[in-house]
Amino acid sequence: MNRRLFLLTGLAAPLAGCATPSRVADLDALRKQVTDTEIAFAKTMANRDHAAFVGFVAEEAVFLNSGKPLRGRDAIAAHWKRFYAEAAAPFSWKPDLVEVLPSGTLAQSVGPVMNPSGVIVARFNSIWRLEGPGVWRIVFDDGYKVCDCDSKQAS
């Protein structure tokens, strides 16, 4: 029995080392998928396409909404419709950091939110879930205002 265990361990060890680099490559590909998805999600605002926005939101998603959570796709869609009402987008966003769990099933994206003049006014934090091959949907979202600390200290 010990000999069999020794043989199995001896065979498995080199294979474990081989599996790691391909997993890293998979995570890189998944990071790119999530980055591309976040960029496409943000384009819905620029393109004024509320229906496309809703398509990125998971059925059971929760948007934290400054401590007043919006629960479910329908509630989120109804609340966000106002941001798509005018001809010009009231804000834009883009990811500057994306990370994926080793399982490849959840990801986090964070980045700046800009006003129409391009000034950073907030940062967002989104959690994405892999719902099918190459299909990521947002399950949690939050944002927070950023401090313009330099100008406040200058006054």
Describe the predicted segments one by one.
Residues 1-12:
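N-terminal secretory signal peptides and thylakoid transit peptides that target proteins
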Residues 6-8, 18-55, 62-155:
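A beta-strand edge to alpha-helix "cap/lid" segment located at domain peripheries
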